[in-house]
């Protein structure tokens, strides 16, 4: 549609708001069944001038909001024929084209020239003053609605739509340093109170998380979750070299040293290196007083009398499996 006064092409405006129903008895006031709600009560209608000032993105938002509102009313059981506004939205597909004319580029009627803009501002001020005065017709008819600003209804609907939208990607903010939870035993601080509670269990020796299969207790829920994988037989960590699978990542890390030949654990007494920390711990038994007598032989192969280890402690498990690591280092 072309506006001859401005020489602009104004998009076809949506239909106007329907007139309120009349009382069958002939009364002039608005009549409606008690509790009845119609689409016209919640819809937003624009005049031709107001519609021409909307950007293509705003018109698309208006279309989505109106269709969503109509769908909500249908879900609530509000019947009746399809409103003219919804039919117009579905028919006028060319209005939602992103390449549609932008009113800012073509100058909105309120921005055509300074004189017209000043006149429009005066009319808006006069209209605002008229809205502030009580209207006798509106005062006598509480059901009638006062006219609203062109974009007020659309902004309210868009805000309500954003509030009702589920926030799937919302993450809780990380507390600041002054809001962290500190342990009263060791002073260590944690971001979340639940983590602090589990940490306090380690000081008290409590193990409130028990396995339902074997009854073993754990101080942390994560430890119980890893333990349950043992009963399920899960081995998610697989070696890329040989394909062997492990239940824990730490076990896979230790196994990879077999392929790489890395030996990060060094004996502080003799400097011998080991790939496993347990291997170094077993090796250190040979440096204890009387440790060489456990096997009954010295490194040179000479037979000696067995000598008890200090404290009558037994060597660790695997002593007889790895005898070479318990020999005295030269």
Swiss-Prot record:
Residues 37-108 form the KRAB domain. Keywords: Metal-binding, Repeat, Zinc, Zinc-finger. GO terms for biological process: regulation of DNA-templated transcription. CDD domains: KRAB_A-box (cd07765). Residues 1-32, 99-150 are annotated as: Disordered. Residues 114-126 have a biased composition (Basic and acidic residues). It holds the Pfam family zf-C2H2. A zinc finger (C2H2-type) spans 181-203, 209-231, 237-259, 265-287. Residues 12-23 have a biased composition (Pro residues). It comes from the Eukaryota. This is Zinc finger protein 747. It comes from Homo sapiens. The lineage of its organism: Eukaryota, Metazoa, Chordata, Craniata, Vertebrata.
